[in-house]
Structures are given as structure tokens and as C-alpha cells.
Amino acid sequence: MKTDSAQVHRVERVDDIPVLLATLQRLKVAAILDRHFPSGHRWKGTLTFGEVACVWIAFITSQGDHRLCQLQPWAQDNLHTLRACLGKTVRPLDFHDDRLADMLDHLALDETWQDCEVDLNQHTVRVYHLDPHLFRVDTTTANSYVEVLSELGFFQFGHSKDRDDQPQIKVALATLDPLGMPVTTLVVPGNYADDPLYVPEIEKVQQAFGKGGKTFVCDCKAASLGTRAYLASTKDYYLCPLPQTQVSAEQRRDLLQPVWQGRQTLQQVYRPAADGETEELVAEGFSLDVPLQAEVAGQQVTWTERRWLVRSLAYALGQHQQLDRRLQKAQEHAARPKTSEVSTSRGQENLKNLKSLGRFRGFMIVGPMNPVFALRDFK
């Protein structure tokens, strides 16, 4: 009796490709891209612009490789998987790097891309039943070893927390909280200032989800009066720490005088605990309302800003321990025999200054920490 042995013609690792493509299909990414970036009569093959882009996104996500020249050989190795997921004939030539470069040129059209981004954001919110009312806006930098070839390029030298000696690009990003889903992205040269980037990002969020009733959580670089006034003019809310350029150290001391004199009641903040556990006290503070006015697009805008002065207990404890170490060191230094009256008086003056700092524990401005937060009043 003759039996036919099974023959293996091709072996492919499916990995996460079907999951990625199914997610993109659920979000209708291909259909949205095709609506805003039609393929045109010179487009060859059965796959559309959007379908090629979806395979490209799946490749970048799965392989962690953004190089154009690597997509075609990867598609060659996964032809059967791609055909099964897309339900169409797939050719390796559909993912040639020249075609991908042309697609990037189309995606770089700002107005068309912004319309596509709005369409995609609105559809994503509908599909996943998200609440688009709380957003977080922030900026960051990305360094590289590339050379700066022109003042018109994106990679430029600028202020960096990591490497000032390397060119960088600057990225502004708006995300939907608490999910952390990216909503809008803006890439600018690395020598741009951060402050002017917030309003354009906020405007793009408002273009997708409308104005009014949204809350934007930002860092202190978004605390410029112009940014806050713009949000007040659109009936939106904001929450951000105020830097010393907005509230000086002397103003903060004046605000804290009632606390030190025992005339200001502090509101306590507790961390929610599980059933049967005791809530943990993590902070305390107080608020005050400040009327503000500014000009936005030639119109006078007035609003009430609620400012919170907050004392984090963990942060205050760290300051307390650091101050005690410095006091002990200063006392030891002051107790040593001095060679002159000048050094003795200088050491005693330093010790006096350190002791006076004890009153500011927890409310001091050290590094990135800021005790004063501002938000547009919800009343």
C-alpha cells in the first residue's frame, strides 16, 4: 500500500502579524488613509496606499526596524501570512523602497495629514468608547550622532537635558489620559523653544474633539500667560506647575506667611487604599483664586485662575533629611579652629542661612519640583 508523504513547501513564522493587522483593520486605518491619500492611476498592484501603509506599520511594530529597504525582504518571507490577513494577492514588489519613499512624500503634506489625523482620532474614540476630555501635552528631545548640514534641517544643536554636544530634534506630543494614547505629534528643529509649541498642539486636539470643556495637563513650560489665556479663551481648562517666572520666590514666601503663623487651614490629600487598609496622607496644601486678564488674537480675555500651594510629605521629608545633613556639616565646620575672623564669620553666616531654610521645608523650589499649581477655575 502506497501512502503519500506530506510535503512542506514553505514555513513562515506568524508571530504577531495577524494581531497587528487585525487591530489596524478594526481602526480602519487603511480606509482612512485611502480617503485622504488616494493611490492614483500610476499605482500598481492590488494593494491600496492604505493597505501598504498598514503592512509597513505592522513591520515597524513587529520588528522594531524603520529602514525602508528592509520591508520588501520581510514581506517576501511572510507572503502567505500577509495574503491570508489581507485577503488579496501580495507581491514583494508592493513594498519596494522607492514606493515607500513616495508614500512618505505624500504623508509629509501638513494640511492633508492633519485632516487624516483628525479623522483617525475621531474614529478611534468611537471604536473604543473613549472619553476625550482629559489630555496631557509635553515636549521631549531626541539626540543623534548625525551632522548638522544646514540651518534649515531638523537636527540642530539646542538645550538638552542629556547631550548638549549632539544635534537633536524636538517633539511635542498630546496624549489622551489616562490611556496615554497619542493624539497629535509635532516635530520641529532641536533649537526651537518649548513655549510656542503648546498652543499649536492644543489647537490640533481641539480640531479633532472640539473646543470647550477639555482639561489639558502640562508641565511648567506651558505656564506662559499666552498659553493659559488661549485655553481660557476657548473655555477649556488647564493644570500646570507655575515656575518662578510666573510666581517669584518672594511672592511664594508671602503666600506661605499665613501657614507659618497658623492662620491658614491646610487641606489634606490621602492616597486611596484597598478595602480594610488605612488611607495614607501624602500631601497637604491650600488654594487661592487669582483674577487674570490677557489679550488673545486682539480680544481681551478675563478669567479666574485657582492656584494651589502643595506640600508633598515625601518630598518634605527628603528636604528635611538633606537640610539636617547640611546643618550637621556646617556645625562641624563652624566648630573647627579658624585661621582668621573672616572665615569664622563666613561659617557662622552660612550656618544662620541654613537654619533659616528650615521654615521652607516642603514648599521650597528645588530642581523640577514646584509647589504652586495653577488651573482655570471650574466655577
Walk through the language-model features, giving the residues of each.
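Anion-binding and metal-coordination hotspots
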Residues: M1-L24, D34-K379
